[in-house]
């Protein structure tokens, strides 16, 4: 883990403070940019420092911190939150976004254990480590409290073919969200989850040319603008702490979801 501050003036010291994981690309980048444009100060976390700097450069005049972080490593996560608190003094929001689909299209009987473990370490263990670190900080800071938004998936509801590791971790993330939400109540910590379907990112680019369907066919699927996801996350983030979107589902209108199994 290492941190580098992107020095940009234009956001006051009273700005709300967010930590966004997986901020170097895709949904994480879109959400980070949306928050920065809205005046939040943001700690941008991800495995590739170069892409984090690219995210920061998209919003001139913002205040942000880039922190190289592998969320599956406890020391990296501890360092991320230490860097954020040292720079900004508190954490008001965690967008718990870092994740991986893993090896797509691999039948369960052929899935290597190491591939399974990598998905679990990133999607579930990483989400837990980040939520735990945020929870500890939000509980002890003054004023107490904050918000955690977990990035679930449509796969938290229904699977795609040959996606056992991804689907299992996203179902588990829903349990994590519910438990954190219950345990956070006494400390003014609101916890919610956004389940996203087919936002246009590098991860979903293949869906526009063809994705495996439950009937065995390969068919293209519609996608939606990732900026619409970012605006939804910002809405959830900016609610007062006495209000919480527990679960939100945002998907491309025509994608196969209802009845896809």
Q: Which residues are covered by each model-predicted region?
A:
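Residue(s) in the substrate-gating loop at a strand-loop-helix junction
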Residues: 153
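C-terminal helical subdomain
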Residues: 193-194, 212-259
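Conserved glycine-rich cofactor-binding loop
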Residues: 24-26
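Substrate-binding pocket helix/loop in short-chain dehydrogenase/reductase
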Residues: 105-108, 112-117
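Conserved glycine-rich Rossmann-like NAD(P)H-binding loop of the short-chain dehydrogenase/reductase
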Residues: 38-54
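Active-site helix of classical SDR
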Residues: 131, 169
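The beta1-alpha1 cofactor-binding region of Rossmann-like NAD(H)/NADP(H)-dependent oxidoreductases
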Residues: 68-80, 113
